[in-house]
Curated annotation (Swiss-Prot):
Protein's UniProt name: UPF0301 protein NE1668
Residue intervals passing through the bilayer: none
A GO CC annotation given for this chain: cytosol
Organism: Nitrosomonas europaea (strain ATCC 19718 / CIP 103999 / KCTC 2705 / NBRC 14298)
Similarity remark: Belongs to the UPF0301 (AlgH) family.
Length: 186
């Protein structure tokens, strides 16, 4: 099988995907290699706001720029841990660069910077992440569980969580309502 790298791509869940957690999700792939893949679901908001998350962590927001943003449920792995997808990459303690401008940070220094109004210009904060073991994502792709498309930062950072999946589908020229898990023959 030919090696593919889906870092900085969107995964769009197909209607037939059997995992209920990922039904109707848009996942941003932060890293994909022969060791596996790591991503964040970017269209599953929680009831928790960034402001409330910061307060729960003992950080007192000095401004309101991002305080009303919803915290996302990034995936079923480590749901008690926070992950910040942001632009620009910056120089935070634990950052994984997905491309030249987008990073994923898991250290508390970025959250303190957000509370101090010194955080990244554009960001999403998620609890948990989505992970795949070596070869697992490739197997799911072969089973038609996902559509893939190169990611666009405008979709991540300028649209609401509800608008992200339809916008990613539009990149492929597809309306989600027209997708089916059934195959027919003429």
């Amino acid at each position: 099988m030919q090696s593919i790298n889906l870092t900085d791509h969107f995964l769009i869940a197909m209607p037939g995907l059997e995992d209920s957690f990922f039904a109707r999700t848009l996942t941003y792939i932060c890293e994909h290699s022969e060791r596996g893949a790591l991503g964040l679901v970017v269209n599953r908001p929680t009831d928790l706001s960034v402001e409330n998350l910061l307060l729960q962590l003992g950080m007192f927001p000095k401004g309101t720029a991002s305080s009303n943003l919803p915290v996302l449920l990034g995936g079923p792995v480590q749901i008690d841990s926070g992950f910040v997808l942001h632009e620009p990459v910056g120089s935070w303690k634990f950052t994984l660069s997905s491309n030249e401008s987008i990073g994923l940070t898991s250290s508390a220094d970025i959250l303190q910077a957000v509370a101090d109004c010194e955080g990244p210009k554009r960001m999403l904060i998620a609890l948990g992440y989505s992970g795949w073991a070596a070869g697992q994502l490739e197997q799911e792709l072969a089973q038609n569980a996902w559509l893939t498309v190169p990611a666009e930062s405008q979709i991540l950072f300028e649209l609401s969580s509800e608008e992200r999946l339809p916008a990613a589908m539009k990149l492929l020229g597809i309306d989600f309502c027209n997708l089916s898990s059934e195959v027919g023959h003429a």
